[in-house]
Amino acid sequence: FNLNVCVGGMGLYRVTPEREVQRVTDETNRSWASINDDSRLRLADDLDIADDGRIFFSEATVRYEMHEWPVDGLEARGNGRIVCYDPRDGSTRTVLRGLRFPNGICVATDRQSILFAETWGCCIKRYWFDGPRAGQVEMVLDNLPGYPDNINLASDGNYWLALVGMRAPAYDLAMRMPGFRKRMAQRVALDEWLFPNIN
């Protein structure tokens, strides 16, 4: 069998049993309203595969490179997206935009939806890709005590959720004050910025 992997800064790749590395995709459809070309995959992060072979994967941010993730957090905008690669026709398309650092994804037990973690949103959401609710998004867990970094289906049908760090009141307050964040970015050295409590 092949191993499909998300490689930050490069895209979606496949490793064959013979250890051959193949690029599956490194771009998706461009946002029609975007001034900047956002078709290149900057930070492909996590993936899962639907029963029909479609690969759903998260791209944490379309604005920043891997080493610039703190700036994405400070900006506190929905720069992330969920992308789908369909091996049946070789197409890649964005299925959800405007997400706050989607950083973890898994096909749900219903096999018609995916669960994904939004790190800066401190939440888990569901996106229905098949069935009567196809295209809908719903909140599953909101206001988590920490920053979710991954979600996986457990062998017993439940889910494992990893938190990369716990929330801090000072950072939560700063996220509600865009003027404060802007002044901090302009006047304070990067290594002294207020950051989330990441392990």
Please give the residue ranges for each predicted region.
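Short, conserved, GDST-rich strand-edge loop motifs in beta-rich repeat architectures
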Residues: 3-6, 57-77, 164-199
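Surface loop/turn motifs at the tips and blade-to-blade linkers of beta-strand repeat domains
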Residues: 24-40, 94-100, 139-145
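Asp-box/WD-like beta-propeller blade repeats and closely related beta-sheet repeat scaffolds
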Residues: 2-71, 79
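Residue-level detector of Asp-centered blade-edge/turn motifs that repeat once per structural unit
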Residues: 49-52, 109-111, 153-156
